[in-house]
């Protein structure tokens, strides 16, 4: 044993807490020896780390106050998901569901003789429903497993109740959420900024749920020496996602204009997950209408959505979900996703978002990419996240019979293949289309009712997806240690243009809104109309991925290891959009469409009266929450009398 290092010694101890969307990172550095010569008495005894959720056990059933759960992982600093791990001691370890009073213990192995070891410990709040509550925890580092059982008395006057009993050679650097999201200092202060906006989905947040994506994009900075990547997200929409797309989009737009935009911003990209795809769409439309100078000064680069319900979820969900959406169980947002006419006249909001004069701003983007889950996503159906039109026959071949549910019509049509995607040049010149007869077969199948057994399976899929947010099925050890053993994730990657679409039926555009009492077919046709409007004059890159459950959160790697099935998707996103210049990113027809003036009865001027649904300042009562937010508010009222939960 190294001199000066006694048996069963606590080397570091700290107590802290995290609220919704917060995480803390502890960078543990251990100097095994210094200098060029290796000491004769050196030992390779492991260090140990313990993380304990110190929240009172009585808070465990108070789900709408929290839940009071932590995610935590321990990994070597030099761990890379693309490297093969030979030694089992180098494998990362994690706990995705650390409940109140539970503890997580990990070994920090010293299995090689080298001067320095560095480990990273991440501790992330799993709170979903309340901004005020917190999860308390303690972290202990000891020189033996037995040392973690020792009782430690802390000096409450120290910041964060830190009891740093540091041993010579050990240092621990604590990083907060703000530290982790801090923009790296630029090498060249004269560089223009490429602003990358990340937007979270329903009952989610940016700071914790999209942290992995943020760090992976920053790694691409070395491939962009002429610009400075600045990755940001609007944090104040957390716990507000039931209030509607307009509420969320206006908040995001004002955040971009008021807090992020300045003369140093030269480019902008948008990346939205789930509901975030619609939120960023509204924000783009709002900025284009209310601040027309913005997109003249700032070049739009990437519009990316991941598992986003761009067409809503009106015709693919179980009946009990449709009824819940219509009744406002999940607030204004649910009604909008159900294509229900609401506060904006006789048209659903998603239809208004596809107006040609507003969608035209998307044509200015250099790239437009949709990532969609083929299976295992019970929240957002494939047809909605991919804007409906796909080569479904090719997908069926790639899936080998897998479906989201036995009644899913997306894998029943006979569609003529559009072609493979061997390289970009082939895609750019692809003129094939979707066979109209086969498309009718697909669309007709979408109307068919499922049998009772299939309905039960579909319902279970929705419930399972909601449950998997916190109890996500985790990859096995081989997934983390051997990249070659991982199953291919990208099963379809293709550019689609308006000319690829089959011709619409003669009656498709007879009426544009689904009114009370009208048939499900009307809403189905509304989805097709919206999808066609999104394709007007633009090309879309559609990437369909095959992920294991929970695919909806795996696609963004909500948590680094428990959602690791999504690593290849994030790698693809970063490589395709931030590490190389795509020669077909801006086809000429897109540029021409973007440069056309939209004549709106006043000589090309777009007065706000034409977009009152977009720019009108709404009464706060319009943005009503659902049952979850209402219950959470009641819970907040209760906890105000129990300060130990929030102090």
From Swiss-Prot:
What Gene3D superfamilies does its record include? alpha/beta hydrolase (3.40.50.1820)
User: A biological process (GO) annotation for this entry?
Assistant: lipid metabolic process
Do the record's keywords include Lipid metabolism?
A: yes
Please state what the protein is called: Putative lipase YDL109C
Looking at the record's lineage, which domain of life comes first?
A: Eukaryota
| Enzyme Commission (EC) number | 3.1.-.-
Q: Where is this region: Disordered?
A: 502-523
The record lists the organism as: Saccharomyces cerevisiae (strain ATCC 204508 / S288c) (Baker's yeast)
Entry-linked SUPFAM superfamilies: alpha/beta-Hydrolases
Tell me the protein family, please.
Belongs to the putative lipase ROG1 family.
Question: What is the role of the protein in this entry?
Answer: Involved in lipid metabolism.
Tell me what else is known: Present with 195 molecules/cell in log phase SD medium.
**Keyword set includes Amino-acid biosynthesis:** no
